[in-house]
Amino acid sequence: MEIEEASRESGHVVCGSWIRRPKKVNWVLIAKASKRRGSSVSSPALLNIFSFDPITASLSSSPLATHTLKDSDGDPVAVSVHPGGDYFVCSTSKGGCKLFELVGGATGITILAKELLPLQNAGLQKCMAFSFDGSKLAVGGVDGCLRIMEWPNLSVILDEPKAHKSIRDMDFSLDSEFLATTSTDGSARIWKAEDGFPLSTLERSGDENIELCRFSKDGTKPFLFCAAQRGDTPMVNVYDISTWKKLGFKKLSRKTASTMAVSLDGKYIALGGKDGDVSVAEVKTMEIYHYSKRLHLGQSIASLEFCPSERVMLTTSSEWGEMVTKLTVPKEWKEWQIYALLFCLFMASVIAAYVFFENSDSFWKLPMGKDQKRPKISLFGGSSSTPSEDHSRWNLDL
């Protein structure tokens, strides 16, 4: 009780997300609840944007920009950043969603609030997601209503008030064709993003609850990963998106997952636990490559997301705030390193050929004539003999 009171008085981080910028620059959006003392608000709810240093794998000490939410909006609940990096949407505790635009450049940025009329009085929205190509926005409410809209004109594709009992999680497929949603009652459904048509309800056993969902993103493996709970055992189910049939399951964490993420290149999948642990597995083998025990000690991880361009992860919790963790996964070759290696191999082959030619007679021990001389060659050119020497050698009358 004392911990809860202290957290309420000092405010807490609600969620966070990466913002992709040009030239592999990444920012971080952190949504923070208001600070309270008794029944009064001592500090308002904030939306902060921090810069990220890939060398030190850390966030800037002070935000690049800050936006203060009005008291009438309440606290932030969830955020979703557009893939283009210029807009993000934030749902609030007093109902409705807010749209924000990032304006500015290297000298400074500003967060501008804009109207989002279709979602202005939509009620409390638990989760939101932009499609991978940025052409659609989906929002899911605690009342079970699912909305899919075109972006940026916000034309309504689907407004289904009875999609679920209460929507818990959602994710778009890599090709932006499908939308997966999960419910607090343990069910999961698949929707056609283009027209909102319900395609399938995922199969599950009688004692199994599907809680979280993420599509594969490597472009070659058309899978849907779902974090599920079967009795007291947490697991990750894998579904084939061509048939929506379960292919199998894998246990990747000891505790129930509170959030899940797949890296932008689709190579890794991560689970954030209700005990504060984080597990990262390679999608190809489904084996654990990184494990952070008690990263957010005793706290359920509220949000978890891979950095778009680095093997770094952003996690948040109400007690410990935001954390940036460098993953202990195998290092990968960068593009310039591959070209450098190919150049070195080419030079090594040229040098080896030259050395072999210089020592070929002694190697094969072939006899040479009394007046015979072996021609000399240059490492980067042809024969070192002049044209006149060649002509005289063959007694040519030119």
Swiss-Prot record:
WD repeats: 71-110, 120-159, 162-201, 252-291, 296-334
Entry keyword Repeat: yes
Distribution of this protein across tissues and organs: Ubiquitous with higher levels in flowers, roots and senescing leaves.
Reported induction: By Pi starvation.
Pfam families: WD40
UniProt GO molecular function: guanyl-nucleotide exchange factor activity
Chain segments annotated as transmembrane: 338-358
Topological domains, Cytoplasmic: 1-337
Chain positions found as N-acetylmethionine: 1
Location in or out of the cell: Endoplasmic reticulum membrane
Gene Ontology biological process: cellular response to phosphate starvation; endoplasmic reticulum to Golgi vesicle-mediated transport; phosphate ion transport; protein transport
GO cellular component terms listed in the entry, alphabetical order: endoplasmic reticulum; endoplasmic reticulum membrane; plasma membrane
Keywords noted in UniProt: Acetylation, Endoplasmic reticulum, Membrane, Protein transport, Repeat, Signal-anchor, Transmembrane, Transmembrane helix, Transport, WD repeat
Record-linked SUPFAM superfamilies: WD40 repeat-like (SSF50978)
Topology term for the membrane: Single-pass membrane protein
Chief place of localization: endoplasmic reticulum
InterPro entries: Sec12-like, WD40/YVTN_repeat-like_dom_sf, WD40_repeat_dom_sf, WD40_rpt
Top-level taxon in the UniProt lineage: Eukaryota
Positions in the Lumenal compartment: 359-398
General function of this protein: Involved in Pi uptake by facilitating the trafficking of PHT1-1/PHT1;1 from the endoplasmic reticulum to the plasma membrane.
Protein name, UniProt field: SEC12-like protein 1
Species assigned in the record: Arabidopsis thaliana
